[in-house]
């Protein structure tokens, strides 16, 4: 074992040993950013970058299991990403489909899709639906795979779903306007029934949310990590948890 690897392991163990698992976030959202830049820096192809990022996911979920995280939301494909050239998009969708199948077949995690299924190719829709069905009763971390996801799209879809529900009930616009509140909209989000994210991690050094979980992250803590997603290490994850535990969450008060 190289000296650098030994020092890294000892340091990671030290950071982990000082973590208070009771203070750990229960729901972590992750913006998996930097695959293409990692590939460029490594002299690889864009597809190789996306594959390296996909390979990191199960490793990261293992770290979440070790630290008692209950829900993880992984932003794998945004609505904007669907506008990429077909020569890049189709291989990326193949990687996402294979990754979701792998998460489902692993047997440790319950997979749930968040996003607009209707804007995705039929094959991708099928893979996501089958993964949900196959893992419905798994007693493990709930893994939200955000594919075809956009924060503004989610809110628009929630409002549309709410309006259609009340239209079926015969509720007039005046009646709906009188009773409408935050909870009514929250009940129609992709993540309805789930806790909001306590911590949102974004890799690659970008310090913006880009529309990720706009509604749910109102009181989330954010951690921006300089490394590209494929290079994200356990020690980076542990540092994010350490940083989160050191903060005093005010929830707007």
What are these model-predicted stretches?
Residues 1-253:
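Flexible, compositionally biased loop and terminal segments
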């Amino acid at each position: 074992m190289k000296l650098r690897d030994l020092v890294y392991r000892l340091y990671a163990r030290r950071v982990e040993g000082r973590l208070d698992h009771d203070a750990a976030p229960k729901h972590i959202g992750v913006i998996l950013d930097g695959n293409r830049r990692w590939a460029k820096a490594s002299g690889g192809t864009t597809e190789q970058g996306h594959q390296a990022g996909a390979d990191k996911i199960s490793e990261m979920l293992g770290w979440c299991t070790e630290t008692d995280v209950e829900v993880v939301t992984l932003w794998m494909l945004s609505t904007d990403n669907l506008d990429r050239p077909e020569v890049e998009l189709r291989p990326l969708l193949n990687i996402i489909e294979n990754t979701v199948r792998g998460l489902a077949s692993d047997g440790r995690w319950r997979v749930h899709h968040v996003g607009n299924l209707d804007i995705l190719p039929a094959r991708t829709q099928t893979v996501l639906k089958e993964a949900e069905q196959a893992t419905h009763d798994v007693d493990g971390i709930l893994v939200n795979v955000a594919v075809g996801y956009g924060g503004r799209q989610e809110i628009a879809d929630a409002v549309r779903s709410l309006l259609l529900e009340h239209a079926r009930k015969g509720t007039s616009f005046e009646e709906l306007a009188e009773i409408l509140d935050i909870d009514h909209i929250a009940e129609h989000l992709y993540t309805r029934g789930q806790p909001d994210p306590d911590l949102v991690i974004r890799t690659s050094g970008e310090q913006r949310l880009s529309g990720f979980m706009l509604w749910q992250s109102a009181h989330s803590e954010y951690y921006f990590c300089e490394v590209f997603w494929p290079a994200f290490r356990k020690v980076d994850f542990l540092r994010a948890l350490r940083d989160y535990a050191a903060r005093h969450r005010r929830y707007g008060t």
